């Protein structure tokens, strides 16, 4: 009986004053949630889905909605002139349009040729920091699927052709009626290709593709960083049955370097210097990324951790004329395995040292003295 039916507005979870846009939005949301394909094996979902569609079919139509608002479900019972909510071809079209949008099926209509784009491929390549600095052209070999030459990618034996699928008429999809609504599904006979290959090509067993080793040249520009991706258009898997090929993506990683650490376009290195050089000052040579050398001047009294900037000796910036800098951090080495004479000289040096020659140490021990002195005076 009509009295047992749930209110259409409640079914769509909208107010009675809802406009067309609100109705459509509510329908999309609920249809997505309760669609049978998203709830396989759940009979209650199918019932709920039918209720949602019935409610939307009535409320989206101005005349039917007016009749429903006045008479309720009785408006569509026999004797009221409605003959039921009237789910016909118009509903199937509306339903199909909405679900093509929801499930991404719009582009699959009439595909009929069975052509599919080839898959994209990934290739991981490790390069050196020097390669990233100078740039290079590398040769790589990769196994890829290419179009079968025996059948020209059709998948059919030479001298034969694929036949149009009789089940779907070449569309690749079939419509299935379920009660008052229609669902569009992949054709079970041709698996969506739209064609049937009765006599497959022996070289590719009907796939239209074979695997071969391919040698490719990869141009690595200056300034690439760890994780840089290079795209080679059309060098991926061959398309299925004449479809376009996919792309090949080269993912670069930089090997660790024995001397330099990279930070964007800047390079960093750590160089040990002698205690004498640090105390008296001097200079030392450091290597550069272009396999040259440059001199660094060290002022007297240099401490461990001090950094020196060498402008323009870093990495080039990708697709730019800019170049980073190199930063050299010094580490003052404490001498080991001293001779007796060296020990005596250092001991003599220590006796002659004062706060002026070791300001940081003098300042620290002064603070220590003050600290213990203040504790001694505390009652």
UniProtKB/Swiss-Prot annotation:
UniProt keywords, alphabetically: Chaperone, Cytoplasm, DNA replication, Metal-binding, Repeat, Stress response, Zinc, Zinc-finger
Q: Name one GO biological process term.
A: DNA replication
The protein depicted here goes by the name Chaperone protein DnaJ
Q: What is the UniProt domain comment for this protein?
A: The J domain is necessary and sufficient to stimulate DnaK ATPase activity. Zinc center 1 plays an important role in the autonomous, DnaK-independent chaperone activity of DnaJ. Zinc center 2 is essential for interaction with DnaK and for DnaJ activity.
Q: How does it assemble?
A: Homodimer.
**Subcellular location, principal:** cytoplasm
Instruction: Report the transmembrane regions from the record.
Output: none
The listed locations are: Cytoplasm
Gene designation per UniProt: dnaJ
């Amino acid at each position: 009986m009509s009295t047992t039916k749930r209110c259409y507005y409640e079914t769509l979870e909208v107010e009675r004053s809802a406009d067309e846009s609100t109705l459509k939005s509510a329908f999309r949301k609920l249809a997505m949630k309760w669609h049978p394909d998203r709830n396989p094996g759940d009979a209650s979902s199918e019932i709920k889905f039918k209720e949602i569609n019935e409610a939307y079919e009535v409320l989206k139509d101005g005349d039917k909605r007016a009749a429903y608002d006045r008479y309720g479900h009785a408006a569509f019972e026999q004797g009221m002139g409605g003959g039921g909510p009237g789910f016909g071809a118009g509903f199937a079209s509306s339903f199909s349009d909405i679900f093509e949008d929801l499930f991404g099926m719009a582009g699959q209509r009439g595909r009929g040729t069975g052509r599919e784009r080839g898959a994209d491929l990934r290739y991981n390549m490790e390069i050196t920091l020097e390669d990233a600095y100078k740039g290079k052209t590398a040769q790589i070999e990769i196994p890829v699927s290419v179009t079968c030459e025996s059948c020209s990618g059709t998948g059919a034996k030479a001298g034969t052709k694929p036949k149009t699928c009789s089940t779907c008429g070449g569309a690749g999809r079939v419509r299935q009626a379920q009660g008052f609504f229609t669902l569009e599904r992949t054709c079970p006979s041709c698996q969506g290709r739209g064609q049937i290959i009765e006599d497959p090509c022996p070289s590719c067993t009907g796939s239209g593709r074979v695997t071969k080793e391919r040698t490719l040249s990869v141009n690595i520009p200056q300034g690439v960083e760890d994780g840089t991706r290079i795209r080679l258009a059309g060098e991926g898997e061959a398309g299925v049955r004449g479809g376009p090929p996919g792309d090949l993506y080269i993912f670069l990683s930089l090997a660790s370097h024995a001397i330099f650490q990279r930070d964007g376009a800047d390079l960093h290195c750590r160089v040990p210097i002698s205690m004498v050089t640090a105390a008296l000052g001097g200079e030392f040579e450091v290597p550069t990324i272009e396999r040259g050398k440059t001199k660094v001047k060290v002022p007297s009294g240099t401490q461990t951790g001090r950094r020196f900037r060498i402008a323009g000796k870093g990495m080039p910036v990708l697709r730019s004329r800019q170049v980073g800098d190199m930063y050299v951090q010094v580490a003052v080495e404490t001498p080991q395995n001293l001779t007796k004479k060296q020990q005596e000289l250092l001991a003599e040096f220590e006796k002659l040292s004062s706060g002026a020659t070791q300001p940081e140490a003098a300042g620290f021990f002064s603070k220590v003295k003050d600290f213990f002195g203040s504790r001694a005076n505390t009652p």
